[in-house]
Amino acid sequence: MIIDIHGHYTTEPQAVFSFRDKQLAGLADAVRAPASADLGISDEALAKSVEPQLRFQKERGADLTIFSPRASGMAHHVGTEAISVQWTRVSNDLIHRICTLLPQSFVGVGQLPQFPGAPPAKIGRAHV
């Protein structure tokens, strides 16, 4: 078995970027913050979004990818503890869903809250 040990989710649906934009806009004006962390992304849309990664896996001869959120999206320099924790949950939930949908192709690795001093326990759970 060939395992790619460093894969990031770089083909997220637009709803992820829209959520993050609203989340960051809420820093200046709370009215603009997202009302919910439910992005409304179906399982089918998630599976379709990773088709490029699956194609790269096949082309490179890899069987499995250790899969994590996009590193640049963590933005440790932006926001508050609450925003960091919420973004961490949203990002990790997407990775978990993809790995649940495609367990033969992906094993998830989560991110931790990127706000200084935010305890990892704030993300509320761990999936094994």
Regions found by a protein language model. Give the residues of each.
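Helix-coil boundary/capping segments in enzymes
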Residues: 1-125
